[in-house]
C-alpha cells in the first residue's frame, strides 16, 4: 500500500477495517479514551462514519484523523485492512 492515501481512499479502508473488526488500540489510545469518557464502541462508530482528514506523517508513519461531532480518532495502517488507533480525544467546547 502506498501512502499517504487520499482522505476518500483512507475513509474506505478505515470503514472496512472497522466493519470487519480489524481495529487494534494502542495503550496510549486506551488511556486517552478513558480520560475523555469515550468507549471503544464509540471510537469504532467514529471510524465507521466519520470524516477523514488529510494524512499527516508523525513518528515514522502516516496518521489519519477521523472526526465525528466532537470526537477525534487517529489511526495508522498496519496493513491495508488493519488499523491501529494511536490516540483519540473529545474536543472541548
What does each model-identified segment do?
Residues 1-93:
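Ribonuclease/tRNase effector modules and their secretory precursors
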